[in-house]
A protein has these predicted regions:
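Extended, charged alpha-beta segments that form solvent-exposed binding/catalytic grooves
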Residues: 1-217
Length: 217
């Protein structure tokens, strides 16, 4: 009988005991901090119906998910915690009190090429506030405080919190007289880490038809 060589699949992680203890400490800090700010813990299935996970993701999402069939069921492993949250709220809407403040810490799976810093199985630690109508902007302002408390409790001394808020951005674009182009501008600026500021500026000028001065601002 051929011997089977033990191995861990590429992009998946197994921790040694000391590393797992460190991981548990991080998880405890997250749970404690999130709970202190009034967020309720939530857990959702790792496996969902493919039609739910792919409802809004399009072809790019389909390339990333682990998808399989069991009998007549078309199933997939969750690739984030946001889509399962949307399903959960839609399913249990009548039983929830709004604004619904939840946190969820769990593994997600993405079938993309494993590389340094990018895994196929990894944890996400989400906090979300779901409103029944418009939410007070104070909910957005609270998030940086939570991040600061989490990182400080972990012993991190130097870190940056980058804020990306559509209301603030829309106000800025409105000030520049670019309200109609705001959606296209935001989609382009989101690519800045992938393609660099020079390419983003070129797209804003050539495709979105901004002036050079507007693109620089």
């Amino acid at each position: 009988m051929e011997r089977i060589k033990p191995r861990t699949l590429s992009g998946f992680m197994e921790l040694l005991p000391a590393q797992q203890q460190q991981m548990e400490r991080v998880m405890d800090i997250l749970r404690t901090t999130y709970s202190r700010y009034g967020f309720t813990p939530l857990d959702t299935p790792i496996i969902e119906a493919s039609e739910i996970l792919l409802a809004k993701g399009g072809g790019e999402t389909e390339k990333q998910i682990y998808r399989f069939s069991k009998g007549d069921s078309d199933l997939s492993l969750r690739f984030d915690l946001t889509v399962p949250l949307a399903k959960y709220v839609a399913l249990h809407y009548a039983d929830l009190a709004f604004p619904f403040r939840r946190f969820q810490i769990g593994k997600v799976y993405r079938g993309e090429r494993a590389q340094r810093g990018r895994f196929r199985e990894f944890y996400q630690a989400d906090i979300d506030v779901i409103g029944d109508g418009e939410l007070d902007i104070m909910n957005d302002a609270e998030i940086p405080a939570i991040i600061y408390d989490v990182f400080s409790a972990m012993g991190l001394k130097r870190f940056q919190i980058r804020i990306n808020n559509r209301r603030v951005l829309n106000g800025f674009y409105s000030m520049l007289g670019l309200t109609e182009q705001s959606g296209e501008i935001m989609r382009t600026v989101d690519k800045i880490e992938k393609i660099g500021p020079d390419m983003v500026r070129a797209i804003l000028v050539d495709d979105v038809k901004l002036t050079g001065e507007q693109a620089d601002e």
